[in-house]
Structure formats: structure tokens, C-alpha cells
Amino acid sequence: MSARGPAIGIDLGTTYSCVGVFQHGKVEIIANDQGNRTTPSYVAFTDTERLIGDAAKNQVAMNPTNTIFDAKRLIGRKFEDATVQSDMKHWPFRVVSEGGKPKVQVEYKGETKTFFPEEISSMVLTKMKEIAEAYLGGKVHSAVITVPAYFNDSQRQATKDAGTITGLNVLRIINEPTAAAIAYGLDKKGCAGGEKNVLIFDLGGGTFDVSILTIEDGIFEVKSTAGDTHLGGEDFDNRMVSHLAEEFKRKHKKDIGPNKRAVRRLRTACERAKRTLSSSTQASIEIDSLYEGVDFYTSITRARFEELNADLFRGTLEPVEKALRDAKLDKGQIQEIVLVGGSTRIPKIQKLLQDFFNGKELNKSINPDEAVAYGAAVQAAILIGDKSENVQDLLLLDVTPLSLGIETAGGVMTPLIKRNTTIPTKQTQTFTTYSDNQSSVLVQVYEGERAMTKDNNLLGKFDLTGIPPAPRGVPQIEVTFDIDANGILNVTAADKSTGKENKITITNDKGRLSKDDIDRMVQEAERYKSEDEANRDRVAAKNALESYTYNIKQTVEDEKLRGKISEQDKNKILDKCQEVINWLDRNQMAEKDEYEHKQKELERVCNPIISKLYQGGPGGGSGGGGSGASGGPTIEEVD
């Protein structure tokens, strides 16, 4: 381990996240405080506090407009982005534009606040970091974070920024399927050699990813990636929600559509039913008072669920075919098929995939929800120099998800780096001028597979000026594309005759956060964290006062004490307890020190009487934070 403690692997998912750590030669997937090994990627804001994870998801029905999820669909994108615009129609929370970047708008502690997607993701990452710290019993400083294979440059960079805001040193951003392959490679280590082609089929809550990798002698190489950013478990839930909402309308002549809370409760029940249907052939749904006081009791069979989603399930095979084409492989050449993502538990999806591969066995040995975090944890251990033999000879080669190039005369896309090129990589090509005496060139950097740049995605542009006058075609301008291991791109253009050069790191034009923005967000994240802690302390002080008061009350009312305590003393304590209970009812939101002050006040009245009761005891001693023992905390201490 490094001097700074272990590094963790975080699978930052669209709907759920997962964290793992590699120690003592194996990976531990870490459960959260609710005992769950995956945590919802949800953040909620209320009048009094900020909630993250299970607590946020559990209150979504009561607070839909201030509960944020799907931040991963916004991260690194522009507000105008067509996918952002279409996603916004489905979200109960508000998305606004600031300088062309999307921000979510919420009411928090009575004020309107806006947050960048990076900030929301950083809150989820903070939760994952805290889960790991609670388990490891110390601070965590470094992490590997995973992203979908086809995240572009700005989405990767924004994810890295989210990690920075959290206060993590992001060792590397790696592709989710690559992480799953590492998990798998580690599982399969020690198999007799040769090159292995592996297909990773990753169907999660919100996204679908197919990747083909070759594994040989501990080296992973990604051959191709394909998928659908908008297919996953939530889509299957939605089909069931629509179906059952129709059924409710038929039975009860009521449309729950406009009622967000009813729809949300139905969706929660559908998600539960869907999970049940992976292991049973029927699931029952019971929702009390779903809408206008009407209960909804029904059931759904696995067959009906499969029929509702038939086209979506079948559609998962298209990206499989595309990935095979891109990798120039026949399906018979795939040695291993690995299932990743909770939705791969659906029996029908497993059957379709198995049939497509002519009955080949699927690998389900790794828990599909945890495989990505598992691999990220292994990669984190490698990067901080873990010397365990289990990870010693593992090398990781990632690829660029899209071709990268520049625009040349006539709006033509000229790629310098082809898609699926292993990274890190560096490519240089020489270009020249288009007209006589041209003194500058505009270098426009694009990503995409189309022949014309107008159909591709502009990443950034810059000018190279000061080219000495010369006939067209004479100057030699050398353009270099350099991608580092995180998939972040530097483009340089240099005039060979003068040595003059200009460069761009492809981030800023894509709405990358500035250094100042990140610093500000780091401070804000700290502030929110300390506010959360202060709130926890406040609640703890309130609970301590409450349990102390009730314990004392119970103690003096105890039959066994009859005759040991005077009526006067007893009433003095009971009156004071009642006064505190009344005060508590009126002051649920008081500050920590007010609760502590009240407790001291109560102790001042009670301690002398209680110590008289247990003669010879040293009167006093604080009643110490309500241990909840039936005899009351003071007594335990005095005894």
C-alpha cells in the first residue's frame, strides 16, 4: 500500500454507484450504512438538510422537484445538446442554462440554489468516499473512477473534475467495460495462455454498453465498443409503469398521469416487481391509497413483463453485432461473454444473448452490479503501486471511443487518430496552406465517424498565426494529436519554417470548469459537508437530550423507588422533565448548544436528587449523551 493509505475504485453509475478497495490480496466491495453494496446516485435537498444515496431516493416521492438523479446524463454536455433537451422532458427537477452549461435548480433551506452536474456527481462521489472511509477506518485520498466507453473527452474531463471537487486525487478515468474485464481477468488468471476474445455485455440502470476486448498474458486491449446511452433498467420500469397505469385507469376510471407522486410510487413498486421477476415467474404489486384514496393491488407475470419489453430486449443484440463488425470478428471467435449491470439478471436477456451465440455459456461468476467497481479497485491498487502478485502482471490498454481529426479544405474530416486506437497515443501529420500568402491557419478539432465535419462534434479550435508569405502548398504545418492515459487530448500545430507553434487542450470549449470554478466548488463541497455534519451533531444532541429526559422520567416513576424518593423531589424532576419535553416539541430545529444547554439545566436539577437516591455516589457527573439504558445514563455512571 502507498504511504497515503489504500486507493479505491468507484463505479459512478447513472442510477446506482458502487465502491471497492483492493487490500490483503483481494477486492472488497464495500456496503453502505444501510447494508447495501450499491448506493443510488441520488442527491436530495430539503428545507433542513441535504441527503445523498438511499436517504435521497427514499424520499423522492415526497420531494420530486428537489431530488436530483441522472447527473451522469448531464455531465460534460452543453445545455443545447439534443439529448439534454430530450432528457429534460422526463425529469421532475428543473434544469437551467448558465453560460450554455446545464445546471439543476433546487430549493434548499428556503433558498433557490443551482448546481453544475459536476457538483451533483461530486456529492455522490463524496458519499462513496465516506462509505469507504467508514469501512477502512481512515481517510481515502486517491481513486480510479469509471465512465461509459463512449463518453467523449469533455464528459471524461468533467467526471475527473467531479472527483477533484470531492477532494480525491483521480488516478485515472477508465472505461467501465475495461474495468469489468480487469475484474474478469483477475478471476480467470492462471488459465492456460493464448489470446482470448471477450465480449462484455453491460446493461445497467440507464445505459447499455457492449465492448470486445482481447486478453493475452495479462494485457487487456479494447477492440471495439458499441451501445445505447438510453437503454437500461429504467426503460423496462417505464414500460411496466405505463402498462399498470393503464390498468388502474381501466379498473378505477382514474388517470394517475398528472400526479407525480402517484407515478413515482408506482415506479418504485415496478422496480421492485422487476427484480422479483428475475427469480420468480410472478410478482404482486400492492400500493395503498395510490391515487384519490384508491388502493392498487395487482400482479404481473414474467411473460407479460417480457412481452412489454420485447422490442427493447431484442434491440440489445444490434450493438452486439456492431461491436463484432468493428472488431472484425465473427461471433464464433468470441471465447468468453461477460455479463455486467443489474439488468443482465433478466432471464430473457440472458436467453437472447445465449441463443445469439449458439448456446454458449455466459459468465455470471462476478456479481453484475459489482464487476465494474471491482475492476476499478484493482486498477487503483496497480496505480498506487500495490505489489500483490495478483495484480503484478496486469497491464491496461484503453481506446479512443471516436475518431479524432481536423477539418481540411471543403469541410472534410481528416482523422489523425482512428476510433478504437489504443491510448495513450500520439499521431503527427503535415498539412499546408490553401491559398497564396496565407498568414494563418485555423485548426478545428473534431470527433466522430462521418466524412464531413458538419456531421461530427467540434471539440475546439485555435489559430496558428505568423506564417511567412509563400505560395499555397509550400508552408509545412505539423499537427500533432496527443492523448494521455485518461483520454484527454492535446493538439499542437507548428510551422516547420519558423518553429512557431500553438496548442489547445481539448476541454475549455466544451464547457470545462475553470480552475477557479473547481476551487470554488471544492470549498462549497466542504461547506455542505460541514453543514451536513453540523446537522448530524445537532440531531445527535437533540436525541441525547430526549433520551436523557425520558430515562430520568422513567427512573423516578419506577415503582421500585417508591419510598426512596420524596414526593417533592419526584415532582421537581417530573416538572422539569415535562418542561424540557414541551420545549423539545416546540424546538425541533434548535442548535446543538441549545440542546446541550437544556440537558445541563436538567442535569443540575436531577443529579443532586439522583445521587442522594444512590447514597455515597459522587453527585454530579454529566448524564452523558443518553445511552438509552433503561435506568438512565446518570445512574449508570454513579453506580
From Swiss-Prot:
It is found in: Cytoplasm, Cytoskeleton, Spindle. SUPFAM superfamilies: Actin-like ATPase domain, Heat shock protein 70kD (HSP70), C-terminal subdomain, Heat shock protein 70kD (HSP70), peptide-binding domain. The modification Phosphothreonine is found at residues 408, 414. Residues 397-512 are annotated as: Substrate-binding domain (SBD). The modification Phosphoserine is found at residue 403. It comes from the Eukaryota. InterPro entries: ATPase_NBD, Heat_shock_70_CS, HSP70_C_sf, HSP70_peptide-bd_sf, Hsp_70_fam. Its main location: cytoplasm. Residues 613-639 are annotated as: Disordered. GO terms for molecular function: ATP binding; ATP hydrolysis activity; ATP-dependent protein folding chaperone; disordered domain specific binding; enzyme binding; glycolipid binding; heat shock protein binding; protein folding chaperone. Coiled coil: none annotated. It holds the Pfam family HSP70. CDD domains: ASKHA_NBD_HSP70_HSPA1. Residues 2-389 are annotated as: Nucleotide-binding domain (NBD). The modification N6,N6,N6-trimethyllysine is found at residue 564. The keyword ATP-binding applies. Residues 616-631 have a biased composition (Gly residues). Keywords: ATP-binding, Chaperone, Cytoplasm, Cytoskeleton, Differentiation, Methylation, Nucleotide-binding, Phosphoprotein, Spermatogenesis, Stress response. The N-terminal nucleotide binding domain (NBD) (also known as the ATPase domain) is responsible for binding and hydrolyzing ATP. The C-terminal substrate-binding domain (SBD) (also known as peptide-binding domain) binds to the client/substrate proteins. The two domains are allosterically coupled so that, when ATP is bound to the NBD, the SBD binds relatively weakly to clients. When ADP is bound in the NBD, a conformational change enhances the affinity of the SBD for client proteins. Belongs to the heat shock protein 70 family. Interacts with FKBP6. Interacts with ZNF541. Component of the CatSper complex. Interacts with RABL2/RABL2A; binds preferentially to GTP-bound RABL2. Interacts with SHCBP1L; this interaction may promote the recruitment of HSPA2 to the spindle. PANTHER family: HEAT SHOCK PROTEIN 70KDA. Molecular chaperone implicated in a wide variety of cellular processes, including protection of the proteome from stress, folding and transport of newly synthesized polypeptides, activation of proteolysis of misfolded proteins and the formation and dissociation of protein complexes. Plays a pivotal role in the protein quality control system, ensuring the correct folding of proteins, the re-folding of misfolded proteins and controlling the targeting of proteins for subsequent degradation. This is achieved through cycles of ATP binding, ATP hydrolysis and ADP release, mediated by co-chaperones. This is Heat shock-related 70 kDa protein 2. It comes from Homo sapiens (Human). The lineage of its organism: Eukaryota, Metazoa, Chordata, Craniata, Vertebrata.
